[in-house]
Amino acid sequence: MRRGSIIGYDLNENTCQISYYDEKSDEPQTFEYAQGQSLIPLKLGYIKEQWVYGKEAELLEQKNPSCVVSDLFGKAVQRKKVRIGSKVHDAVWLLAKFVGLTLEDFEDIRFITFSTPYTNIDMSKMLKGIGRHLGVDKENIYVQDYKEGFCHYMFYQPKELWQYESAMFFCDGQTIRAYMLRRMNVANGQNRDMFVTVDEV
C-alpha cells in the first residue's frame, strides 16, 4: 500500500493522472501505474467476473470491444446507461468504479481534489458523490477546473514569476488548449491586493 492522504485526481475525456502528497515527504508525487507511465487511459472493462482498467482495458478492447467502455467521463457527465457485455450499468457508477480501482494502492485518503477541463454544478455533485463513495468526508472533497488549478499552482511558485504572464498548455493527443494567467491592474494603484485572471486563448 502507498501512503498518500492528499490526492489530486486530474480527469478528462481520455485519461486521468493521479498526484499524491504524504506528510512525510517534501513534494507531491505523480503516481506511475506502470513503469514510466502516469497517464492512465480512461477505459474500463469487465471480463471473467473481473474489472480491468487503463492499458489492460485497451488490450481487452482489441480482442472484445463489447466488454470495454471508453469515453467514460463524457458518458458519466451525460448520465448515460452503458452496456458492458450482457449487463447495462449507469455511467456514473462505472466512473466511480474506475476511480476506485485506480486508487486501490492508497490506504488512507483524507482529502481529494478532482481537476477537470470545465466544471458545472452537476459535475461537481457527481464527483463529490464519487469522493464520498471512496470514504472521504464531504467537506474534504474539492472540484476545480484547469483554470482554477493553474491559479493554485502559480500561487505557490516564487513571487518573481508573478511579474510575467504565465502560460499552461494542455494536450490530449487530439486538442491543444492554452491558458494564460495575467495580473490585473487595480483602479487604485495603492491597493496591495492582487487580482489575477486566467483566460483560455
What are these regions (language model features)?
Residues E107-Y118:
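Short glycine-rich phosphate-binding loop at a beta-alpha junction
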Residues Y20, S124-K128, H152-Q157, Y179-R182:
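Short acidic, glycine/serine/threonine-rich loops at helix termini
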Residues M1, W93-F106, G149-L161:
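Phosphate/ATP-binding catalytic cores across multiple sugar-kinase/actin-like superfamilies
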Residues M1-K81, R132, N140-H152, A187-N191:
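Early-domain small/polar-rich strand-loop-helix modules and first-structured segments
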Residues R2, G8-T15, W162-R177, L181-N185:
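A short acidic Gly-Thr/Ser loop motif
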Residues W51-Y53, T175-I176, M180-V201:
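Phosphate-binding glycine-rich/basic clefts of nucleotide- and phosphate-handling proteins
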Residues I130-G135, E139, D145-S166, D172:
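Hydrophobic, small-residue-rich alpha-helical packing segments that form membrane-like cores
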Residues A76-D108, K125, I130, V198-V201:
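Glycine/Thr-rich phosphate-binding loops that ligate phosphate moieties of nucleotide
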